[in-house]
Amino acid sequence: TGMIVSTRESEKVRGRLLNLGISQISGASRTSVGGYEKEERVHDSEQFEVSDTRTLDEVVGWLMDNGHIPSFCTACYREGRTGDRFMALCKTGQILNCCHPNALMTLTEFLVDYASEETRKKGFEMIERELNKIPNEKRREIAINNINDIKASNRRDFRF
């Protein structure tokens, strides 16, 4: 149902592929065993060479600059919406009532917990615009409440 582009590809190639419909893109990847445990990359043990070496904050900012909503959502997998269940929601267009608010809520978590001030500002402006585009009014209201809760507390992991 989608294709993923890794950091093996350059920023330029990744940008072109996003505009062709790529649904997932990695950022700040580490490709060596134990690579996420250390700040410094161990280049001689990497599985492949990374072409896009930007930080996750830079990739998230770049995605928003290009009109994409960065999402850290894993709700479908965690809720068992896989295979036929997932495809049924996709074919009817109802997945939008899950994906869109989930993307905005997970983006809020990233912005609050990890983003630079510049990325945070950009992200909250995008979220404000995008909330009005959630088609289901009840879902929109719940998403707004959850986003406000994420900003005001340590509560996380809201999902539809």
Please describe what each predicted stretch is.
Residues G15, L20-S23, S29-F160:
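Radical SAM enzyme core and accessory elements
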Residues T1-K12, T31-V33:
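Conserved C-terminal portion of the radical SAM core fold
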